[in-house]
Amino acid sequence: GHVVVVGGGPGGLEAARAAAGRGHRVTVLDRADHLGGTARFSSLTTPMNGELVRWLSTAVAEAGADVQTGTTATAETVAALEPTAVVVATGAVRTRPDVPGANLPHVLSGDDLRGLLTGEDLGARRPGRLIRLVLAAGRLLGITDNLGRVRALSRRWMPIGRRVVIVGGGLVGTELAEFF
């Protein structure tokens, strides 16, 4: 059969690898230009996550899956592939904390920050024009494609204010604190 996997993060890549290993024809669709999802971004502070993404990406390619990055999956695009099965692995849904001010323009979620730093969503929380221009230039020049460069540059400059409060002391919050 033909398995279509929507989402190129670790869950989607593992589903694709497993399906291809069982003899299925596999197509992976991911709207981002790079595989890995949040794990790829988190490799900025936790390089092992990047190793996992590289391993899964290589395993999926070696298994013969058709990987289509920069492709938004819609009902029409998926149906056109005539799959016998569809796996939706689009990642976790995170919500903003229900606290006063959480929706103010200068308040960023981890997803907002990822969108800014990778250039994937420059309108995430409406940063100033200069910041959007700098980040757009970085994306056009390919700077945001290389997480090593993003890591090095983020040590010198972040597209947010000088005073930062991080809400949450779990893994993501502590990883994020390494930027500041």
Task: Describe each PLM feature range.
Residues 1-32, 68-82, 89-99, 112-180:
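Rossmann-like dinucleotide/flavin-binding elements
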Residues 31-39:
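NAD(P)-binding Rossmann-fold cofactor-contacting core
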Residues 39-41, 98-101:
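Short acidic, glycine/serine/threonine-rich loops at helix termini
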Residues 39-83:
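N-terminal Rossmann-like dinucleotide/flavin-binding domain of flavoprotein oxidoreductases
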Residues 44-48, 105, 126:
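Short, hinge-like loop/turn segments at secondary-structure boundaries
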